[in-house]
Amino acid sequence: MERRAFLKLAAAGAALVAGGQVATMLGLLERVSASDLPATGPGAAHQWVFIIDLRRCDGCGECTTACQTEHFLPADQEWIRVYRLTDASGGDYFLPVMCQMCERPPCVQVCPVTATYRTDDGPIAIDQSICIGCRMCMAACPYGVRTFNWDEPVAVPEEARHDGPDLQIPQVQGTVGKCDNCAHLAREGDLPACVSKCGMEAVYMGDLVTD
């Protein structure tokens, strides 16, 4: 098996185990045709994307911690998860997985209240003010990277609070959360938290339109 194929299978397998929604997800995906899903529109000013160099990642988890700190997430919520995997030759490597901001996102298609949508510059966002917590998007996500806010939000300083789909601090109880590409930082010309805190320089962010 080629390494690329192995990585895709390993990532999908880990996501399915983490999500615990195998049967439900497969049923949804059978009903969703990729050709029916919205792609990024032409003429967009930006198209933010992540690139991860697996040769550099040492599994330190600093990206996860940085994300949690930036978004005031509890310790049990990981918007970027680092998996330890073994390749066909028996060697170990680490695979960070976050929201892939799919070109044709199943989560957008299945959301019954349009709480999940694509922004003009590419990232898939969640408007927690209208999310009903049905978790259909979690079942549809092929990467298992969405989390549910079961508990009351963590204590957050007043100056750090922010309400909006681009940045929700703290998270709203009873809704779904996920990587937001640190869009609030990117629009100011700054790097996402996971990128700036990666000591191995394994995580990159680029713009498919301008770079």
Model feature map: region roles:
Residues 1-17:
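N-terminal secretory signal peptides and thylakoid transit peptides that target proteins
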Residues 2, 21-59:
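C-terminal segment of N-terminal export signals and the immediately downstream linker at the start
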Residues 21, 28-33, 58, 62-82, ...:
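Iron-sulfur cluster-binding cysteine motifs and their immediate structural context
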Residues 46-50, 95, 122, 175:
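Short amphipathic alpha-helical segments
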Residues 52-55, 180-186:
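Short, well-ordered beta-strand elements within core beta-sheets of diverse protein domains
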Residues 80-91:
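Gly/Gly-Pro-rich "capping" loops immediately C-terminal to redox-active cysteine motifs
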Residues 89-104, 138-145, 161-184:
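Short Fe-S-cluster ligation motifs
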Residues 156-157:
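Membrane-interface interhelical connector segments
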